[in-house]
């Protein structure tokens, strides 16, 4: 048991230590420009997305209190599914947000908030890459339902250089 834990820890250190690009949020994120609908191109496997087949979108709407309303939707075998949440700036780097999908009355609990870092962003906000400090989460998002294959490969390579396990990416949309 102990040798398994040591081996697992060594593997994680090696993965993160091998990163040649820093894993950190972008320094400039204009929430008004980021708002709107994004189409998911790819993501790391997550329990809460296990039933999503395709047509995965995230729509962000600015709210008066400086947060963003979040509406995630996807097509499942039984039709469309959706969930609503809130994203809030963390007060640190501009691209560092936290999201929650738990009810508002649970918002005071730290464990209902997840880190949502915009780690790469097209200057014209045509695509974005969202990750987390743990590298457990990774989404490649686009304003259009598909993405140029060359652009995706470049994004994937940079995510790998940041230490993300890109070999596990699940494709959610076609590449052009």
Model-derived features: where do they sit?
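A beta-rich soluble binding module of mature secreted/lumenal proteins
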Residues: 2-3, 7-176
């Amino acid at each position: 048991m102990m040798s398994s834990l040591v081996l697992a820890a060594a593997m994680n250190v090696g993965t993160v230590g091998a990163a040649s690009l820093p894993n950190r949020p972008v320094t400039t994120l204009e929430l008004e420009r980021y708002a709107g609908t994004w189409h998911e191109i790819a993501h790391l496997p997550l329990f809460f997305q296990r039933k999503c087949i395709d047509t995965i979108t995230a729509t962000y709407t600015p709210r008066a209190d400086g947060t963003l309303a979040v509406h995630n939707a996807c097509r499942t075998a039984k039709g469309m599914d959706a969930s609503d949440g809130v994203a809030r700036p963390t007060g640190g780097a501009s691209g560092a947000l936290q999201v929650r999908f738990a009810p508002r009355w649970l918002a005071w609990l730290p464990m209902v908030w997840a880190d949502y870092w915009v780690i790469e962003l097209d200057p014209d906000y045509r695509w974005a890459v969202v990750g987390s400090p743990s590298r457990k989460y990774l989404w490649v998002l686009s304003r259009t339902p598909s993405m140029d294959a060359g652009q995706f490969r470049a994004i994937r390579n940079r995510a790998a250089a940041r230490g993300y396990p890109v070999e596990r990416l699940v494709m959610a949309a076609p590449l052009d």
